[in-house]
């Protein structure tokens, strides 16, 4: 009895092994027949098969009921100048609700969840044919916690984009254009396409740059230059950034407007894709990539103060590798020192000679400026006298009389002699006053009085002149007696007395000053 039970168990095990082996052989045979078809293993979001011309995908557990509380996202991507057509099998059921608020299928025209909404679907009737306007389509399936259904199965294919039929569509193949970069940092630039002749002039550009960071590092991307020839026309030109691989589900950012922001990747592999059609070949970009690790930083790395640690070799290299310029902020002194050393080595002799010449000229100039004023002062002290000092600082008309010093001395001698004669005449004329009055009468007295008043009034008036006119040949005798000449024939004695009396104010003025006789004579002119 026990032997029979053991045989039965062995038979069951043998049958099970044969069934498993048969399934494995069948699977291998099917894989060999489907060359070029990529199978996505069964996951919580169902099966997704992709080919070069399209593919198909389904809801989880299809054709059985899908599980509750599920959310699956499918992003379809066609080649450039192509669009996507999406169809559903007739076996279709998603929990119906008003405006499909519960279980539903959401489809958008583009690669993002914020792309234009095509529609939301639910119920028992499968959607009609859906066609995208570009090369991307975003699809999301969502279920709530109750009332599950059969689900769906969809097929998609790629068709030529009618907007590019004049360029040949998919009949005009795009050349293969791929580049690879790696290391602590580097530059990704679109000009590399022309330099390496990856495409010919007039052809569209669809190039991919694959970046690999250093071990255990991530990638930071910063645009140094960016310009799209046709801004905001993503069909014609764009730059896309992928994180990890070039699969559409790894799309991190896409730029086709006028601004491109920095991108921080979560993996050590980044993919940059640039697309530009035949009419957008002037589009360009230049991007810096930097490998970084997260803190804490080691001794061989530099802390960027932005959750980044970069290699020490990137510090003060003239390029901003950190998100903020911490790695280049304290490098000014070092750069200036290096520049000074370079100038000293190459032009030290010229700078030294020039500096010496300038220094010598400066010293000579200072000595000349200091020594020249001292010579003038010494000369003045040596030849200084009161008369010369007075002549320099008195008004200019005093210098004119100093030039005629000899003539003035002779005139002063005559004046002194006349004054002496006047004194003698006055003493002798006292006794003969009556005789004098009898001959000249009261008229002479009035004339004398008027002459005396005239000379006394004339003196202060002439003293007010600041600068006398240039004098002619000096003749004091003629000038001082000219106004009495007309009356000399009437009374010679009175005329002589009047002439001498006119000089009395001048004599008083001369005696009242200590300067010289030059000032008294200048008043008469």
UniProtKB/Swiss-Prot annotation:
Residues carrying a glycan: 311
Any one Gene Ontology cellular component term annotated for this protein: postsynaptic density membrane
Disulfide feature: 45-72, 100-122, 177-207, 234-256, 297-309, 304-322, 316-331
Modified residues (Phosphoserine): 409
Keyword annotations: Cell membrane, Disulfide bond, Glycoprotein, Membrane, Phosphoprotein, Receptor, Repeat, Signal, Transmembrane, Transmembrane helix
Membrane-spanning segments: 348-368
GO BP, one annotated term: regulation of neurotransmitter receptor localization to postsynaptic specialization membrane
CDD domains assigned: CUB (cd00041), LDLa (cd00112)
InterPro entries for the chain: CUB_dom, LDL_receptor-like_sf, LDLR_class-A_CS, LDrepeatLR_classA_rpt, Sperma_CUB_dom_sf
Posttranslational modification: N-glycosylated.
Keyword Translocase applies: no
Free-text function comment from the UniProt entry: Accessory subunit of neuronal kainate-sensitive glutamate receptors, GRIK2 and GRIK3. Increases kainate-receptor channel activity, slowing the decay kinetics of the receptors, without affecting their expression at the cell surface, and increasing the open probability of the receptor channels. Modulates the agonist sensitivity of kainate receptors. Slows the decay of kainate receptor-mediated excitatory postsynaptic currents (EPSCs), thus directly influencing synaptic transmission.
Oligomeric and partner information: Interacts with GRIK2 and GRIK3, but neither with AMPA-nor with NMDA-sensitive glutamate receptors.
Record-given protein name: Neuropilin and tolloid-like protein 2
Organism: Mus musculus
Lineage: Eukaryota, Metazoa, Chordata, Craniata, Vertebrata
Gene: Neto2
